[in-house]
Each structure stands twice: as structure tokens, then as C-alpha cells.
Amino acid sequence: GLGDVYKRQIDHYGGKDTRVFREVTETGEALLDLAQIAGSTTKAQAAILHDCESRWAMEDAQGPRNMGLQYMNTVKKVYGGLRKLGVNVDFLDMEENLSDYRIVFAPMLYLFRAGIEEKIRKFVADGGTFVMTYWSGVVDENDLCFLGGTPHGLMDVFGLRSTELDALYDQDVNAGVGEGKTYEIRNFCDLVKTNGAETLLAYRDDFYAGYPALTKNVFGEGEAYYVCADFEQAFYLSLIHI
């Protein structure tokens, strides 16, 4: 048919004085100029810890919200914030190496596998930036609660201790405020007691108005941020700029 007549040639004329010939030639020259990047890769500078066993443990916990833990939405907000800023992202589980990255996010890392706290500690001490959210480091790999405070094994790294987690009704809204900025909060509000961490944002409403909603702690050569609440997407765009 007609497809066989036209599909495999530049044209039927055979000369060099046509627009199509010139454009095909220019395309070939451009591809030669790009030969040096053939096979090259772009190394991600950021990573997100996303662990299926931790998610399963959260879903099996039957709380603190019986409906709507919003775990995957939280992961998507972190990822979306990074990608909107043009940052390449790798997804890791807790068995993988962190040292290849400049910044690592751990959204709702409820379950800590053995050794992850030491891995995070070393990453921050060696100069990395680690961002952890509320409801992290609560149970071990056997789904048994840690004793002594959360986030388990990292309270000195983050310069704080989580004291309680408030679960909001669907219609409830709080906010994190600071430095002239306000970010909407829904679903979860972690109440923390700081021990060296700097408060960057504070809760606006409820009995914990003024409590930290976002903190930063310098540990070794690096920095550890603790996101105390379920913030809106715009918060993560701002956080990555901090």
C-alpha cells in the first residue's frame, strides 16, 4: 500500500537541494555532537526510604487513625517536591547504602529494621542531610514497640523526643507558621520535646500552639530535620530550599 511507498526514504527525488535533505543532515550532525554523552547516566543526589514492611506494620497497627494513614500521599508529596525542583530521586529500602546521597528523606518510617539507626547516625555525622517525619522509629522489625522514646536510637541525632501523636479528624486543619510563612496541616501532629534542636516552624492552633512543627539539629558534620506534621505539598517545596 501507500505506506510501503513512502515510509523508508527521505524523498524520491534523490538530490541534496531539498529542505528535507538539509534537515536530515542537520539531525545527523547534531547526533554526532551528542556521541560523547552516549551511555552516560545522571546520579541522583536525593533518596527516599520507602519500605514495604514498614508500611504493612503501620496498616496493621489499627491507629492512630483507623482510616486514612496517608502514607503513600506523604511519600508522593516528598517525591513531588523534589521532582518539581528538578532533583533526581532514588527509592531505597533500609538495607541499602545511604552514603552516595546528599539528602535522604524518611517519610513515616514507622518500623526500624536492625541497624538502620546506626546507618542514619553515620550518614548525618559524615555530612549528610536527613529528613524524617512524624511516626518514625516506633517499632522494630518484629513489630514490637521500642522502649525509651522515639525516634528510637536517634533522639540525640534529631535533638528531640516525640512525646505524643495527635490524630486529626478529616475536617480538622492546623498550620505550621514561621518566618512569615504558613503551611496547612492535616491528619497528624507530632508533639516533640526538643533537646538542642532549633524550631523552624511552630503549630498555630490547638493546645499545642507554639510547639515545634519543624525542627533542625546539627549533628557531627551534617543536619537532621524532623517534620512533625502532615504538611501540604507546598511545604516540601520550601523545605528542600532550606
What function would you assign to each model-found segment?
Residues 1-241:
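Carbohydrate-binding surfaces of carbohydrate-active enzymes
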